[in-house]
Structures are given as C-alpha cells and as structure tokens.
Amino acid sequence: MTKGILGKKLGMTQVFGPNGTATAVTVIEVGSNVVLQKKDVETDGYEAIQIGFEDKKEQRANKPEKGHAAKANTAPKRFIREIRGVNLADYEVGQELKADIFAEGEMVDVAGVSKGKGFQGAIKRHNQSRGPMAHGSRYHRGPGSMGAVAPNRVFKGQTLPGQMGGDNVTIQNLEVIKVDTERNLVLVKGSVPGPKNSCVLVSTAVKKN
C-alpha cells in the first residue's frame, strides 16, 4: 500500500558507508503531519487521506480552514495534500505521522516545486545548441527557426524563450539512506526538487526497481 508524508527540504550533505564510500543525500525534516480527513468511496468516490503539515498563523486562516482543522483537533495547516492508494483502516482523523513510517532501504518518490529561474532563453531552458561565436556568424544564442512560412503561425510546443522553473517535479526511485526518529529527519539518496526550506511530498515509489 502507498504511504506518504510532507516535509521541509533542509539541504544536502553526505553520509559515509561502512566501506568508506560517500553518498550524497538530501535531508528532509518531516516534522509532525496530521491526518485531517479520510475520504472513502461512498462519500467522495475514491479512497484517500488528507494530511496537513506546518501550522499556519491563526490570523491568516479563514473560518472554513479553522473548522476543518478543528475536526482533527489541530491547528490550521500551511500545506495540505492528499495521498491515494492507502489502507484507510490504518489511519484515524487527528493521527500524527512521523519519520518512522519509512525505513532504511525503502524506495520513495519525492515531489516538489522546482526552483524558479525567471525568463530564460532557449539554450538554458531547452538545452538547445548555440551557433558559431565567430565574427562572421550572425546567429549565436537565438531560438532558431520557428517553422515554415505556410502555416502562417507558430505551432504549439515550439521551444522558445520564456518562464523557466516553478514547475511541479517528481524525482522517482530515491533510496532512503537513514531515518532519524528523534529529530524527525529522512535522508534520501541524491537531490530533490526545490530550494531550501521548500515543502516536498515523500511517498512510496510507484515504479519500484
């Protein structure tokens, strides 16, 4: 069954194995997640749990948010996500989820919002090749041809300059290297999307190797 938890990306470090090999890991502080709601087929048409992470200031929460959180005997949350494919019998409204739901060696998917890069050209945004940088060349870092004249328009999906980053990104099949239950930290192998202190969702890997 699927399981997941929300956390905050703290940054990267390295962990040394028994044979002295260094493994780059990302440290995720999962804190205390609270089950805000259980959804079932009869009421909602599908099965899922809704979890909340990180308390929101009371003056920033509206009345529906306060009422929704009160049913779980908790404060309104900044980040709320749904996780499908879970066994509803294992969860209760108001239950706290911590780092110990994962174990070392498990494979997980980590989803987050990628770093925003602003308005970027085709070379940085789409990994296009540049033209010759010689004096005689009249093409260096432009987007290149946008298609034939005949359609009288530019087709959708053309690789052009524009806003880069700030997208929902999921990195699949990352190994859990270490779980620190005292400090509620999960260390996963490799990098995960987003800047430091951003919210990420750690869930059971969908495509297990």
Curated annotation (Swiss-Prot):
GO terms for biological process: translation. GO terms for cellular component: cytosolic large ribosomal subunit. Pfam families: Ribosomal_L3 (PF00297). GO terms for molecular function: rRNA binding; structural constituent of ribosome. Part of the 50S ribosomal subunit. Forms a cluster with proteins L14 and L19. One of the primary rRNA binding proteins, it binds directly near the 3'-end of the 23S rRNA, where it nucleates assembly of the 50S subunit. This is Large ribosomal subunit protein uL3. It comes from Brevibacillus brevis (strain 47 / JCM 6285 / NBRC 100599). The lineage of its organism: Bacteria, Bacillati, Bacillota, Bacilli, Bacillales. The gene is rplC.
